[in-house]
Structure formats: structure tokens, C-alpha cells
Amino acid sequence: MLILPATTVDFFLAGLEAFMRRSGQGTHWGVTVLQLEAKPDAQTLTKAWEEIHAQHPMLGARLKRQWRGWRWVWETHGTIAAPPICWHGVQGLPPGEEVIQERLQGRSSSGALTTPLWLEVFPWGTEGGHVILLTWRHALLDGTGINLLLEKLAAGACAAGPPAQTMPPRESMARIYKRAKPLTDRLHEMTSAGCLSAWMKGMPTGGRPEYRLIELSREESARATARLRALCGDFLQMPFYAAMAARALQLLHERRDWHSPEIHLHLPIQLRGRSRELIFGNHMGAMPLFLEAGALGTLDLAVAHVLEKYREGMKQERSQASEALTTLAAHLPLSTFIPMVRWTNMGQICSLFHSHTGSFLPGRTEFAGAAVQNIYTIPSVSAPPGLGIFVSDYAGLITVTLAWRGDGVSQAEIEALDRRIRTDLTGIAQE
């Protein structure tokens, strides 16, 4: 038996999934879509797929509490066999919403998914195009992990396993509490003022996962990239997309005549040490930002405000405080974690889920021998917060995914969010 360290984010996602199960929202899955111009090479893809499973025992691991020391660890009893890649027959259209929604609920055409990764290849159209759906369990993968996994599959080999991992040193509870207290105090300030998401008390929490893709053209993507560089520089992308997401949520509040003085946004921050072989387990921590609703009037103002709050958070070591607070919470029973978060946050978890997945397959134009047209990720979200906005980027082509649950967001609201996001990204007002 192999014991591997778990991160605080592993615990957070396990707690979130426990809440989703109890509230009828199922398990937490994501789907990454690869649009190819030709059929991928079956031998290359199968070899890498089987090597991934043979080299990474995390794919068969379970998150468990270690009684000695009372901390969460990944427990594995060895590797698991790779599930066969599913090669579908010729279809006139690429896999549609019903297929992807089924995968987001952890199901395939033959029943419930029993492994954390599921790979399918769909031929479509008359010119040899193919679509790959990679369905993945969020408990074991995040955006960074998906990027690393795709690089291994694209290369056609994964002969190297993960590096040896050691348990982090123990700290006294007093030191952890001291590091967490400034964030605890700030959260109390926020909740006393009120902070809403796309969900509020009395709204349903169930319903199947829904999504809308906002696919920018190459010209629109170039305009968005130019705006990003003008406002944030060449290396800091997250504040630009965080500002866009916050303004989209603010529009939703305005349309519903809701008033939320602050928007509580979690900015993803690299938590684990970087390694191209450390694919599974969650890499990212969170930098909690508390954005003032009145400072988001235009995208330029919103980006400046996010950057100001980001610098403030870095100065106050808020990402470290967030990790410390989750470390304290990890001593709770898993089933009580999210209910405790909601109790302290007046029914909410945060204002919305948001992430920029980074650029897929940088420098690569092919995947398993087939030219790539586009790659994007479609995650599922819970309610609350009821809305997720996720940005994918492949070779300069930007795709935004809106994700929600059931009837939590109306079709008219989705159309309005689509227009606001396109306007903010391109700088061109949408009709």
C-alpha cells in the first residue's frame, strides 16, 4: 500500500463533492474537448493512455483520513488497468449537449463511469474530422493536471511515473490558526455586509449540469489578447479574466435586482511544486479576493480593481491564510465542511467559480498525429454558487464556458451574459 500526501484543495473538492451528492447534484466531473482535423493514430494514443494508467497509482487512489495525525492522504494499492478507449462509429455531427451532459453526470452510454478518466473518439462530418472527449474526475485533476495529461497523450508516451512525494512537516495548531485569522476576520466582515452568487436562499440546488460555449473567432481572440496585454502585461492573465467574470456576475445581479456590495472571488494560485510528471491531485490553491461592486463599472476599471486587490492579497499573504484556514477545516468530518462554509457565508460558498485553464499544448499543432483545431474544457459546477465561468486557450483561440445547474440561470440571462463577455473581451459592443 502506498500513502501519498493530499493537499488542502483535495480536501475542499472532496467536501464539495460530498455536498453535491447530498443535494442531488451528483459527482464532480469535467470534460475536455479536442477538435481534430483527422483521425488520431490509434496505436500512439492507446500506448500513451495505457502508460498513464500503468505509471500513476493516483488513478486508483482513495482520499482517506489517516487516524495517526488526523490528516487526509491518498491511499493506493497499486495501479489500475486503463479502460479501453471508446472509438465511436461515423456520425454526421460532433457529440452534442446531451452526450456531454451525460459525461458531466459521470455516465457513459453503457452506464456509470467507474474510473476517473474516460476517453472517447468521435468521427464527424464528411472531411475526416474527429472529436475527442476526455472525461475526468475533478477530485483527481484540475486545469494544470489536464494540461499535463494532454501533453503526455500528445507525445504518445508516459514512461516516467510521478516523483517521490513526502508528507509535509507538521505545524502546531496555534501557528496555523494565527496564519488563518486575518482571512477569518475578513470573511466575517464580508458576510455581515452580504455577498450573493448566482444562487440565493430558496432557489433549487439540483438539476442537471448545463453549459454554453462562447467561441471567439481568431480575429476576436486576437482583439481579446491585445486588450489583455494592454491591461495586464504579457505574464499576468488571471486578473483580466477574473474581472470579466466578476462583471458578468454583476450583470446577473442587476437583471435580478439583487444587491451584493462585494463579490467574493477565488483567484487560482499555484500551490504545489511544479513537475511535468506530477499530474494527478490538485495543484492550485486560492487567493480570496473581495471585489467592491461599485468598482466594476467598465472592464478597464474592473481589471485595475482586481490588480489592486491582488496586490493587497499578496501583501497580506491571503493565499497562505486560505490554505491555513482549510487546514483547520480539514479536521472536521467531510460531510460537515461545506455546510459549515455556508453557515459562515450566509448560505453561500463563494460568488462564482472561475478559472483560466492556461494555454493547452503550447507549441504543439498535432495530437496523436492529427492536426488540432481547438481545445477547451467544460466543467460542472454546484449550486451554490450556481455559476462558473471558465476560459480555455489553444494557439491563441479563446473559448469561454458558462456552466450552471438546471433552471438556475434563464436562457435570457445566458444570452445577456454572452453579450457582456464578448463585449468585454473584444471591446466591441454586441447587439
Residue spans of the language-model regions?
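Histidine-centered divalent metal-coordination motifs
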Residues: 56, 137-138
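Structured interaction and signal-relay segments at domain junctions
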Residues: 73-85
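Acyl-thioester-dependent acyl-group transfer interface
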Residues: 1-71, 88-117, 216, 220, ...
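Non-catalytic, low-complexity flexible loops and terminal extensions
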Residues: 1-15, 88-90, 127, 140-225, ...
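Hydrophobic (often cysteine-bearing) scaffold residues that line and stabilize catalytic clefts
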Residues: 41, 96, 142, 146, ...
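Catalytic-site-adjacent helices and loops of nucleotide signaling machinery
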Residues: 197, 230, 234
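Short amphipathic alpha-helical segments
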Residues: 237-246
